[in-house]
Curated annotation (Swiss-Prot):
NAD(+) binds at G8, A9, L10, G11, R12, M13, D34, G102, T103, T104, S128, Q129, N130, Y131. Keywords: Amino-acid biosynthesis, Cytoplasm, Diaminopimelate biosynthesis, Lysine biosynthesis, NAD, NADP, Oxidoreductase. The gene is dapB. (S)-2,3,4,5-tetrahydrodipicolinate binds at H161, G170, T171. This is 4-hydroxy-tetrahydrodipicolinate reductase. It comes from Methanococcus maripaludis (strain C6 / ATCC BAA-1332). GO terms for cellular component: cytoplasm. Its EC number is 1.17.1.8. One of its GO terms (molecular function) is oxidoreductase activity, acting on CH or CH2 groups, NAD or NADP as acceptor. It catalyses: (S)-2,3,4,5-tetrahydrodipicolinate + NAD(+) + H2O = (2S,4S)-4-hydroxy-2,3,4,5-tetrahydrodipicolinate + NADH + H(+); (S)-2,3,4,5-tetrahydrodipicolinate + NADP(+) + H2O = (2S,4S)-4-hydroxy-2,3,4,5-tetrahydrodipicolinate + NADPH + H(+). The lineage of its organism: Archaea, Methanobacteriati, Methanobacteriota, Methanomada group, Methanococci. The active site is at H160, K164. One of its GO terms (biological process) is diaminopimelate biosynthetic process.
Length: 270
């Protein structure tokens, strides 16, 4: 039985992961953690997420080290925000706890700080902007399209719910990274357009971020040239697709000794 701690336990992703862990053979929720001074601290996380009592009380991130030690957690799952996630990763890795990280919005410095802690403490971690299986097939397909349609104009469009705090999305940035790594030409990433921009240059890859309503996550990459347009789209209609992917990542990383992995590793797409 793999003992799992979940941060952001009452968030949209955290609560979904907790529910699915309780339905998954071989996994057990041993700690549920949320922000300091949370008003529901000390209440049963099962009752808070509609499962009924499961015997795990909500704790807070200011007591993370003690919670991880007392619970014996082997894997910690973090879908929160960049700054607290870095601190969580540093604490967990110091204690030898493996990680599944789905948080987005890291600065390069934050990402480097987190990866340094993981490497120095010789734990294993999967880090991904999107754990949905379909979106990773989307990423893999982008490798081929960028290689074969590298002389086309390329634009990226992403849409999310009005509550999303970072833009562009981590998934859109990952798509852009994959495209740039597979183009046989120079490229320049830009974000939206405004005013008199002049003609579009061949090097431009532009990301457009839309926000509104309850959109879980839509991503489209458009390859266009004179006479034709190819669009590759992925749409998440339920967070359960992300939750299911995170569960796979927990199972994958649980028995790994050390290393930093991504969802291509989890899904054997490399």
């Amino acid at each position: 039985m793999v003992k799992v701690a979940v941060t952001g336990a009452l968030g949209r992703m955290g609560s979904g992961i907790i529910k699915t862990i309780t339905e998954t053979d071989g996994l057990d929720v041993v700690a549920a953690i949320d922000i300091p001074n949370h008003p529901k601290k000390g209440l049963d996380i099962g009752e808070l997420t509609g499962l009924g009592k499961i015997g795990v009380l909500l704790s807070t991130s200011d007591e993370l080290e003690d919670v991880l030690k007392e619970s014996g957690a082997e894997v910690l799952v973090d879908f929160t925000a960049a700054a607290p996630c870095v601190n969580t990763a540093k604490t967990a890795s110091k204690l030898g706890v493996n990680l599944v990280i789905g948080t987005t919005g890291f600065t390069p410095e934050q990402r480097a700080e987190m990866e340094k802690a993981i490497s120095e403490n010789k734990v294993a971690a999967t880090i991904s902007q999107n754990y949905a299986v379909g979106v990773n097939i989307f990423f893999k397909t982008l490798e081929l399209l960028a290689q074969k349609l590298g002389d086309y104009d390329i634009e990226i469009l992403e849409m999310h719910h009005k509550f999303k705090k970072d833009a562009p999305s981590g998934t859109a940035l990952r798509a852009a990274e994959i495209i740039q790594n597979n183009l046989n030409r120079d490229s320049n990433l830009i974000y939206g357009r405004e005013g008199i921009t002049g003609e579009r240059t061949k090097e431009e890859i532009c990301i457009h971020a839309l926000r509104g309503g309850d959109i879980v996550g839509d991503h489209t990459v458009i390859f266009t040239t004179e006479g034709e347009r190819l669009e590759l789209s992925h749409r998440v209609t339920s967070r359960q697709s992300l939750v299911s992917g995170a569960i796979r990542a927990i199972q994958f990383v649980a028995d790994k000794k050390e290393g930093i992995y991504n969802t291509f590793d989890v899904l054997d797409l490399n």
